[in-house]
């Protein structure tokens, strides 16, 4: 097997990535496959942190738009990410991988509080760390949480696993002429409003020079291929590096 290209990564997954073909919840087959691939990468010596969204269980923004208090809705969304984190922890432990779920909101009987130094120590010991409950603050997405945690723990790159193999100029499922980008700058993403992550997350990565790769997590073996450099998605980085 090829050697890993990174020492420490942060993998961002949407909650929807856990649904598979279902309309709601967690697909056992999907979460087992993801856990197997994460375990395979971990055994290569790569330190892995993850942030998972909660949209497969609850979408706070949707209910807020329908009239629910936004702060309450966002808190409910944070709890959904804890549920996903616990599910992934269980799947990883079935793979024989030590895993810790660390929450940005206190829920001590279920998982650890997020403490940066402790998280880094877990990673150094070879444990997979799942960061749950977003940033712990309303009005911030799990993409922003992923950017923040990647920077805090000193990840080499943030990998965003999606249902497409990169960033396109338009929705490739609707526009046959949509162009796939190999490389983008942070400013291009912001100026062209490309659907990589929300603007807050992109600006945070830009200001701290955290590289982003968007790739297709639904393709079996994709994570291992990305880590070993056999496959790439769309890279987002500073303009002076292109």
From Swiss-Prot:
<protein>
    <recommendedName>
        <fullName>Uridylate kinase</fullName>
        <ecNumber>2.7.4.22</ecNumber>
    </recommendedName>
</protein>
<dbReference type="GO" id="GO:0005524">
    <property type="term" value="F:ATP binding"/>
</dbReference>
<dbReference type="InterPro" id="IPR001048">
    <property type="entry name" value="Asp/Glu/Uridylate_kinase"/>
</dbReference>
<comment type="function">
    <text>Catalyzes the reversible phosphorylation of UMP to UDP.</text>
</comment>
<dbReference type="InterPro" id="IPR015963">
    <property type="entry name" value="Uridylate_kinase_bac"/>
</dbReference>
<feature type="binding site">
    <location>
        <position position="171"/>
    </location>
    <ligand>
        <name>ATP</name>
    </ligand>
</feature>
<feature type="binding site">
    <location>
        <position position="168"/>
    </location>
    <ligand>
        <name>ATP</name>
    </ligand>
</feature>
<keyword id="KW-0067">ATP-binding</keyword>
<feature type="binding site">
    <location>
        <position position="162"/>
    </location>
    <ligand>
        <name>ATP</name>
    </ligand>
</feature>
<dbReference type="Pfam" id="PF00696">
    <property type="entry name" value="AA_kinase"/>
</dbReference>
<comment type="similarity">
    <text>Belongs to the UMP kinase family.</text>
</comment>
<dbReference type="GO" id="GO:0005829">
    <property type="term" value="C:cytosol"/>
</dbReference>
<comment type="pathway">
    <text>Pyrimidine metabolism; CTP biosynthesis via de novo pathway; UDP from UMP (UMPK route): step 1/1.</text>
</comment>
<feature type="binding site">
    <location>
        <begin position="135"/>
        <end position="142"/>
    </location>
    <ligand>
        <name>UMP</name>
    </ligand>
</feature>
<keyword id="KW-0665">Pyrimidine biosynthesis</keyword>
<dbReference type="InterPro" id="IPR036393">
    <property type="entry name" value="AceGlu_kinase-like_sf"/>
</dbReference>
<feature type="binding site">
    <location>
        <begin position="12"/>
        <end position="15"/>
    </location>
    <ligand>
        <name>ATP</name>
    </ligand>
</feature>
<keyword id="KW-0547">Nucleotide-binding</keyword>
<comment type="subunit">
    <text>Homohexamer.</text>
</comment>
<feature type="binding site">
    <location>
        <position position="74"/>
    </location>
    <ligand>
        <name>UMP</name>
    </ligand>
</feature>
<keyword id="KW-0963">Cytoplasm</keyword>
<dbReference type="GO" id="GO:0006225">
    <property type="term" value="P:UDP biosynthetic process"/>
</dbReference>
<dbReference type="GO" id="GO:0033862">
    <property type="term" value="F:UMP kinase activity"/>
</dbReference>
<feature type="binding site">
    <location>
        <position position="55"/>
    </location>
    <ligand>
        <name>ATP</name>
    </ligand>
</feature>
<feature type="binding site">
    <location>
        <position position="59"/>
    </location>
    <ligand>
        <name>ATP</name>
    </ligand>
</feature>
<feature type="binding site">
    <location>
        <position position="54"/>
    </location>
    <ligand>
        <name>UMP</name>
    </ligand>
</feature>
<dbReference type="GO" id="GO:0044210">
    <property type="term" value="P:'de novo' CTP biosynthetic process"/>
</dbReference>
<keyword id="KW-0418">Kinase</keyword>
<keyword id="KW-0808">Transferase</keyword>
<dbReference type="InterPro" id="IPR011817">
    <property type="entry name" value="Uridylate_kinase"/>
</dbReference>
């Amino acid at each position: 097997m090829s050697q890993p290209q990174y020492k420490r990564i942060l993998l961002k997954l949407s909650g929807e990535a856990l649904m598979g073909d279902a309309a709601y919840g967690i697909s056992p087959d999907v979460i087992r496959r993801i856990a197997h691939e994460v375990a395979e990468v971990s055994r290569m010596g790569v330190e892995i942190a993850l942030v998972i969204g909660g949209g497969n269980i609850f979408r706070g923004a949707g209910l807020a738009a329908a009239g629910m208090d936004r702060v309450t809705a966002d808190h409910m969304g944070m709890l959904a990410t804890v549920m996903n984190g616990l599910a992934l922890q269980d799947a990883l432990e079935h793979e024989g991988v030590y895993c810790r779920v660390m929450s940005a909101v206190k829920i001590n009987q279920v998982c650890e509080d997020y403490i940066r130094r402790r998280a880094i120590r877990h990673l150094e010991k070879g444990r997979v760390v799942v960061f749950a409950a977003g940033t712990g603050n309303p009005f911030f997405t799990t993409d922003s949480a992923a950017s923040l945690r990647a920077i805090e723990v000193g990840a080499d790159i943030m990998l965003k696993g999606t249902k497409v193999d990169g960033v396109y100029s338009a929705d490739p499922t609707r526009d046959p002429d949509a162009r796939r980008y190999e490389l983008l700058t942070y400013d291009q993403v912001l100026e062209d409003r490309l659907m990589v992550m929300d603007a807050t997350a992109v600006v945070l990565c830009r200001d701290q020079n955290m590289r982003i790769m968007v790739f297709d997590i639904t393709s079996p073996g994709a994570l291992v291929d990305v880590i070993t450099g056999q496959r790439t998605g769309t890279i987002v980085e500073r303009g002076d590096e292109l």
